[in-house]
Amino acid sequence: MAAVSMSVALRQALWGRRVATVAAVSVSKVSTRSLSTSTWRLAQDQTRDTQLITVDEKLDITTITGVPEEHIKTRKARIFVPARNNMQSGVNNTKKWKMEFDTRERWENPLMGWASTADPLSNLVLTFSTKEDAVAFAEKNGWSYDVEERKVPKPKSKSYGANFSWNKRTRVSTK
């Protein structure tokens, strides 16, 4: 009910502004654009965005994507979580699931010597927050897919004193 009463209050405030704008235009005889109308439409669009439409049945959208059929039917997608960068200790890049496609034929461009391909999906990498979202997207587009499960590293229990032990390789003299 709060959204409805807010809308009514906004309508009354904007209607008052519109009447004042119309009166000002009629007095000055200069055509100016009424801003209150666009503000009212903006307020209505914001209320429409909050109402989501959910479709329970699975839709096949392969015919309307614009991708040639040979790239849809024979396409294999790989769904995975990227590995941590070995040069850094952070794991921020390993939170999202990624989908990439198999490599198709490439050739060397005779003019510039660059690697060329006729595959529109070759350099496409999609990012998803969950594995289920990635699988649903692949099924919706009609692609076959392989899922590589996330590899969770086992924490190694070490003591700080192990860094200074004399019988380990860490304390071998370099002289």
From Swiss-Prot:
Name of the protein this chain belongs to: NADH dehydrogenase [ubiquinone] iron-sulfur protein 4, mitochondrial
Keyword terms, alphabetized: Electron transport, Membrane, Mitochondrion, Mitochondrion inner membrane, Phosphoprotein, Respiratory chain, Transit peptide, Transport
Pfam families found in the cross-reference section: NDUS4
Keyword Lyase recorded: no
Membrane topology field: Peripheral membrane protein
Compartments in which it is found: Mitochondrion inner membrane
Purpose: Accessory subunit of the mitochondrial membrane respiratory chain NADH dehydrogenase (Complex I), that is believed not to be involved in catalysis. Complex I functions in the transfer of electrons from NADH to the respiratory chain. The immediate electron acceptor for the enzyme is believed to be ubiquinone.
Modified residues (Phosphoserine): 173
Transit peptide, from-to: 1-42
Molecular function per GO: NADH dehydrogenase (ubiquinone) activity
